[in-house]
């Protein structure tokens, strides 16, 4: 209830991520929205039961004010993480709109919340949480504004509730899927059924019982509310365990070019918000994104900035130059490639590929002379005497310039080299004391 996840088992966290239920862990828009909804319903019902006419007249505004205060208190209790701050701003804009007799759920409210957050934290624009939150919120607002006036609604409230749950889970999943694939290189095939079986329970059981436990806490009776919370969370854990057990529950997605996500976001916004024939031009942008993502080319060679690991891309996955060590880097490379292998398998590929890339990291041959040819790339963590016409990257040079990615052309020659630390004016004007990138021809 306060965002503390230290007691969770790593296996459970992994199951939640594979089923796209990890958003239930962080205090974000879902939790804040459910809390505010519970408070709005409870306070407004209480006001309507009171015999005072003026209280009934302003029941909606009183409930909105109490819900706003509750959200502010919850923000403080949870520690005020960035995701919680973002959620608070979003619900605060909605509740203030209610206080001033404005429409609470609208695209203007979403835009205002985004503007406030970007004024407070401009760097949030590039964070996955900000992008996914506002993608889901914008999509849900557009979907429910359409649903409100559509002919698909039933006269039965129960049927509309079920359809609403399905629609919200489907729309939010579709809206956040490209951002999750871009940032986390993972697409969950079981996200929709897992969320449909879990998210409604958060609103029906977990959050109301959590609010009840807070109310009963001063009297030492919070166990009654926490019992319902435990039942709901146990159900969610079982759902995550069941769906994550499928062999094809997830797929690794290759990282596309940086322009893909901005073009996709702008194109979708134009398609669903713009009025007029011009909006159909956004389909060109969406088509280019799909083409660019499907033809994304990963680097043939990746070199760690400490010269501790080298990876060569093969059809089976990325071959790694060491049997162990630099595990986090190897995992990130595999996720970005969309072909995640364990370290032993990746090292086995290194033994079988016909390599023009050599990695000198073992101290057994420390300082020994090495001769190279023009077709080879040598990466050395140690002080080797390397002679020849090859390209050499040593530890000192990599520490200064950052990790390196290399692409080859159709003729087998290097077509592009990119590094993690682009040279600044200061770096260009300051002579390098040690390290080398040598290409003697």
Residue ranges and their predicted role:
Residues 1-87:
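Aromatic-rich juxtamembrane segments at the membrane interface
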Residues 76, 80-264:
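Internal transmembrane alpha-helical bundles of multi-pass membrane proteins
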Residues 29, 33, 62-66, 87, ...:
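Alpha-helical transmembrane segments
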Residues 37-45, 213-214, 265-273:
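Hydrophobic, aromatic-rich transmembrane alpha-helices
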Residues 313-441:
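Extracytosolic and intramembrane catalytic regions of membrane-associated proteins
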Residues 131, 163, 247-301, 306-308:
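Glycine- and aromatic-enriched alpha-helical transmembrane segments of multi-pass membrane proteins
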Residues 122, 298-300, 366-367:
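Generic recognition of flexible, low-complexity loop/linker segments
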